[in-house]
């Protein structure tokens, strides 16, 4: 039996500069939906890509001394690398410079021209190059007047200066579809989400009257040329929007994917381009006599405390920085938990670090670590299949687990990601409280309570399994690691439909002997400072007055052996304000290292960190403690910061 299909798209991004956290927000949200729908059993197709034509790209390439494609290939490589880091599960990546797209754009344009929806005329209007958008005088922000006449102004979308442009252009007669579009809105009240966006489209754009749309340009030549009039380049409204069907093979020799997946179930985008997707795109599809997408969802902006992100303000957040230092799960979790989907949200370094420490490290990570440690301590790591008595709290706990699943599913269907995650964390917090209420350490002292102790452990493991499955659309590394450490290897027990009833984990399990923290705690002050520093624009390089150290030969450097290791224990050295005694794990070996970082880190804050260790130093004694290596750190103005490595690097890996 064929699966139901689900087709989801992000906007295609304009690669005129490096992507920021806002672009990652849209794409992670799409990925969360795609993963969730796959868990529900849908045949999902998830599309993202890049909008690569236009005047701004041409100017950027010329400034860089490259051809347009040379410039674009470099930019797209960075974008694809970012999506790979975030483990975005897209099924296709469309580039508007691809031949498969170009051919569809040409056919669509000529069809609309032939049937009279497009006509040739002359356009004069206010144009913003960065936005690739024309505006009427009434739409301009901060208009500039001379002798009572508008002579300039700014884009209402981005605030960039506009210029008066006059050129021959093809126009798309969208006004004739106004009544049909409004009728579609009435028949499909959930088409535009959130509802406030629908009111904005009707009141601000449709009711004042839709003006015919300029859909070609002659002032630049980087784009798809109109086949019947090659001096014209097809403008963004048709070129970019058509990607949603060109990627499926519409009007190609093979329309299998188009027939299977169209119409789209949801188009995701930021709110500044909802007008194009909720007015122009539906009208274009009507003109082509194609079904319309089922939903257009416009999420809000990620703002900073001082407004929108801007390089000049030094408040642009590079998602690569967050992923490289804190991991993809912490980054994905923050975006989906802290920012209510559909509304604007504010990014702060403080909130990012707090979410990572309190939600991920303390609540989730500590629950997993405590549970595995207790199973090792009380059952030698082997928890038998439970068949004993229940604790008086268990019925409420089991009922809450099932209610959490229902609430989670309801919120996921309405794209309330933050609320869905909140319900999971209430369940995680309640499970942590369950440990305190059942007091396994007391039960373990009474041999007559052995079966009850096994029951408590079984409920903890089952609760963790429930939470882990629900987190799979959001987190990618942590669920795999949790199932690995719990040794729950049956793939059926990783599935969403296994949560229809409580207690599916009926088999005995053998947990890992040495649980590794899933999310190491962060040093709050140090990491907030690090994120803030990373947001600043690059400083001009000045020559240092301090002489560098004597140069060494590569053979000298080659003598130093540096390996990746995980800190598994740490404590203060008695009678020392500077030293910490640290135990690290290197592949199959553990070592003790004494490090002078006590003034900058508390012992509990560094457990679980992946660090770089010099492993071939001669052993030394510091304050009576043996030290078998050196943990590398960076020093600036007397402040030491541990050099953290990505968690994906295995212990013992040689750093070169």
From Swiss-Prot:
The UniProt annotation places ATP binding at 311
Provide the E.C. number(s) assigned to this enzyme. 6.1.1.10
**Keyword tags:** Aminoacyl-tRNA synthetase, ATP-binding, Cytoplasm, Ligase, Nucleotide-binding, Protein biosynthesis, RNA-binding, tRNA-binding
User: Per the record's keyword annotation, is Zinc-finger included, yes or no?
Assistant: no
Molecular-function annotations in GO:
ATP binding; methionine-tRNA ligase activity; tRNA binding
User: What broad class of enzyme is this?
Assistant: ligase
Where on this chain is 'KMSKS' region (motif)? 308-312
Q: Where is this motif: 'HIGH' region?
A: 13-23
The listed locations are:
Cytoplasm
Task: Please name the InterPro entries in this protein's record.
Answer: aa-tRNA-synth_I_CS (IPR001412), Anticodon_Met (IPR041872), M/V/L/I-tRNA-synth_anticd-bd (IPR013155), Met-tRNA-synth_bsu_C (IPR004495), Met-tRNA_synth (IPR014758), Met-tRNA_synth_2 (IPR023457), Methionyl/Leucyl_tRNA_Synth (IPR015413), MetRS_core (IPR033911)
What is a biological process (GO) this protein takes part in?
A: methionyl-tRNA aminoacylation
Domain tRNA-binding, by residue range, is: 556-656
Major subcellular location class: cytoplasm
Query: What is this protein for, i.e. what is its function?
Result: Is required not only for elongation of protein synthesis but also for the initiation of all mRNA translation through initiator tRNA(fMet) aminoacylation.
* Family matches, as PANTHER family: METHIONINE--TRNA LIGASE, MITOCHONDRIAL, METHIONYL-TRNA SYNTHETASE
Family under the similarity heading: Belongs to the class-I aminoacyl-tRNA synthetase family. MetG type 2B subfamily.
Name the chain's protein: Methionine--tRNA ligase
């Amino acid at each position: 039996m064929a699966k139901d299909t689900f087709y989801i798209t992000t906007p295609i991004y304009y690669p005129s500069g490096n992507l920021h956290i806002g672009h990652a927000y849209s794409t992670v949200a799409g990925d969360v939906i795609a993963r969730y729908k796959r868990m529900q059993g849908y045949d999902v197709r998830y599309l993202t890509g890049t909008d690569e034509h236009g005047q701004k790209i041409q100017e950027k390439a010329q400034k860089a001394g490259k051809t347009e494609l040379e410039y674009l290939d470099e930019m797209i490589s960075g974008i694809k690398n970012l999506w790979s880091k975030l483990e975005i599960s897209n099924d296709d990546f469309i580039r508007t410079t691809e031949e498969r797209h170009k051919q569809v754009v040409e056919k669509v344009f000529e069809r609309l021209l032939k049937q009279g929806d497009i006509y040739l005329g002359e356009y004069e209007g206010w144009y913003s190059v960065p936005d690739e958008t024309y505006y009427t005088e009434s739409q301009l922000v901060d208009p500039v007047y001379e002798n009572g006449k508008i002579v300039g102004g700014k884009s209402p979308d981005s605030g960039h200066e506009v210029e008066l442009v006059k050129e021959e252009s093809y126009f798309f007669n969208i006004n004739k579809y106004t009544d049909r579009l409004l009728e579609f809105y009435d028949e499909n009240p959930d088409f535009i989400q959130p509802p406030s966006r629908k009111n904005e489209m009707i009141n601000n754009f449709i009711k004042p009257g839709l003006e015919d749309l300029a859909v070609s340009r002659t002032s630049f030549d980087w784009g798809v040329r109109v086949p019947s009039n090659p001096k014209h380049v097809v403008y963004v409204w048709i070129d970019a929007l058509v990607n949603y069907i060109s990627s499926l093979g519409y009007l190609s020799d093979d329309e299998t994917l188009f027939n299977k997946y169209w119409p789209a179930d949801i188009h995701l985008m930021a709110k500044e381009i909802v007008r194009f997707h909720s007015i122009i795109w539906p009208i274009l599809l009507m003109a082509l006599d194609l079904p319309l997408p089922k939903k257009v969802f416009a999420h809000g902006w990620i703002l900073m405390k001082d407004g929108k992100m801007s390089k000049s303000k030094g408040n642009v957040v590079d998602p690569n920085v967050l992923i490289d230092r804190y991991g993809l799960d912490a980054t994905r979790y923050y975006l989906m938990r802290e920012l209510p989907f559909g509304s604007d949200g504010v990014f702060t370094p403080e909130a990012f670090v707090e979410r990572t420490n309190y939600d991920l490290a303390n609540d989730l990570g500590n629950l997993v670590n405590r549970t595995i440690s207790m199973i090792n301590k009380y059952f030698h790591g082997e928890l038998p299949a439970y068949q004993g008595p229940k604790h008086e709290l268990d019925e409420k706990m089991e009922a809450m687990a099932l209610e959490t699943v229902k609430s989670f599913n309801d919120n996921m269907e309405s794209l309330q990601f933050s609320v869905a995650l909140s319900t999971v964390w209430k369940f995680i917090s309640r499970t942590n409280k369950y440990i305190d209420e059942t007091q396994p350490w007391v039960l373990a002292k009474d041999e007559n309570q052995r079966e009850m102790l096994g029951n408590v452990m079984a409920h903890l493991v089952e609760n963790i399994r429930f939470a882990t499955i629900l987190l799979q659309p959001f987190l990618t590394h942590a669920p795999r690691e949790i199932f690995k450490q719990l040794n729950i290897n049956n793939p059926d027990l990783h599935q969403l439909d296994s949560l229809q009833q409580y207690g599916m984990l009926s088999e005995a399990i053998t947990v890992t002997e040495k649980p590794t923290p899933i999310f190491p705690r962060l040093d709050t002050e140090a990491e907030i400072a690090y994120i803030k520093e990373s947001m600043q624009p690059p400083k001009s390089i000045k020559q240092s007055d301090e002489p560098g150290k004597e140069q060494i030969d590569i053979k000298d450097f080659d003598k130093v052996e540096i390996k990746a290791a995980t800190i598994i224990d740490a404590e203060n050295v008695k009678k020392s304000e500077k030293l910490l005694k640290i135990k690290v794990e290197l592949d199959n070996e553990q070592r003790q290292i004494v490090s002078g970082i006590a003034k900058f880190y508390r012992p509990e804050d560094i457990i679980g960190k992946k660090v770089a260790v010099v492993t071939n130093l001669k052993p030394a004694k510091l304050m009576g403690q043996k030290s078998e290596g050196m943990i590398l750190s960076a020093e600036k103005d007397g402040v030491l910061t541990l050099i953290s490595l990505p968690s994906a690097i295995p212990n013992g890996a040689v750093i070169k």
